[in-house]
């Protein structure tokens, strides 16, 4: 049965991985691509790194701790550790975004956004504002939605349907209710919280959004982390955006 809401939903905020595209895309495609390309990018730099370099990679990497900037080996070990431990480091996110940009632009990467998510964003953008909130950098978000795999296998740019983007540097960490309060203030809905709907696969993020006054649902896609019985009782859950009645 489609899920409806007591108050009209005027704004939708979407998570990315596990919500609009398979959670496996990041872990089995984007992360490995980054780690595959990283060694050659780091070995091309001159050490010790300088923040005033004309190289975008060197400029980003110069923000990492001084003790890991002494050689390509130490920097590779450090960044690889951040990736493998899924550390939400803003500098790492910037570096990943730059390398993914190269991959998207040369056609090696395309985002497998769910068909129902493409329909949802395309149709709802005509009458509502749609924002993205992800732990990935805003640049990475724009790249992903700018290179969505279309029905014919060619990349499609969906950014024209989106009203804005948030990441951990602009809104805060996604499991903290204050981050959603910041978004509400930024979009002018701090007094109309229930008119905003946040969709995510992560129950802690959904709980944080609810604490901030938003409507929020858990998206249960194939491959996502299994939901506990307690979660199933505590949260409203959808398996596809077609389950929503807005």
From Swiss-Prot:
Top-level division of the source organism's lineage: Eukaryota
Binding locations of substrate: 134-135, 174
Residues the record lists as binding Mg(2+): 15, 17, 201
GO annotation (BP), single: L-methionine salvage from methylthioadenosine
Protein's pathway: Amino-acid biosynthesis; L-methionine biosynthesis via salvage pathway; L-methionine from S-methyl-5-thio-alpha-D-ribose 1-phosphate: step 3/6; Amino-acid biosynthesis; L-methionine biosynthesis via salvage pathway; L-methionine from S-methyl-5-thio-alpha-D-ribose 1-phosphate: step 4/6
Cofactor(s) listed in the protein's UniProt record: Mg(2+)
Molecular-function GO terms, alphabetical: acireductone synthase activity; magnesium ion binding
Cofactor note: Binds 1 Mg(2+) ion per subunit.
EC number, UniProt record: 3.1.3.77
Catalytic activity reported: 5-methylsulfanyl-2,3-dioxopentyl phosphate + H2O = 1,2-dihydroxy-5-(methylsulfanyl)pent-1-en-3-one + phosphate
InterPro entries: Enolase-ppase_E1, ENOPH1_eukaryotes, HAD-like_sf, HAD_sf
Stored SUPFAM superfamilies: HAD-like
Subunit structure: Monomer.
Name of this protein: Enolase-phosphatase E1
Lineage: Eukaryota, Fungi, Dikarya, Ascomycota, Saccharomycotina
Gene that specifies this protein: UTR4
């Amino acid at each position: 049965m489609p899920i409806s809401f007591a108050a009209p939903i005027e704004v939708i905020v979407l998570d990315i991985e596990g919500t609009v595209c398979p959670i496996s895309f990041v872990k089995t495609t984007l992360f490995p691509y980054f780690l595959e390309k990283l060694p050659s990018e780091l070995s091309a730099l001159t050490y010790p790194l300088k923040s005033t370099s004309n190289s975008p990679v060197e400029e980003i990497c110069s923000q990492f701790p001084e003790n890991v900037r002494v050689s390509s080996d130490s920097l590779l070990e450090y960044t690889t550790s951040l990736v493998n431990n899924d550390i939400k480091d803003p500098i790492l996110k910037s570096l990943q975004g730059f390398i993914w940009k190269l991959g998207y632009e040369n056609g090696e990467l395309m985002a497998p956004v769910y068909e129902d998510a493409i329909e949802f964003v395309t149709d709802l953008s005509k009458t509502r504002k749609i924002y993205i909130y992800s732990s990935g950098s805003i640049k990475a978000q724009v790249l992903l939605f700018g290179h969505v795999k279309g029905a014919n296998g060619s990349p499609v740019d969906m950014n024209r349907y989106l009203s804005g983007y948030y990441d951990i540097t602009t809104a805060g960490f996604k499991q903290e209710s204050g981050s959603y309060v910041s978004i509400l203030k930024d979009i002018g809905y701090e007094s109309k919280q229930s008119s905003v709907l946040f969709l995510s696969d992560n129950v802690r993020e959904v709980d944080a959004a609810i604490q901030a006054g938003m409507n929020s649902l858990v998206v249960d896609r194939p491959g996502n982390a299994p939901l506990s019985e307690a979660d199933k009782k505590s949260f409203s859950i959808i398996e596809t955006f077609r389950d929503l009645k807005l």
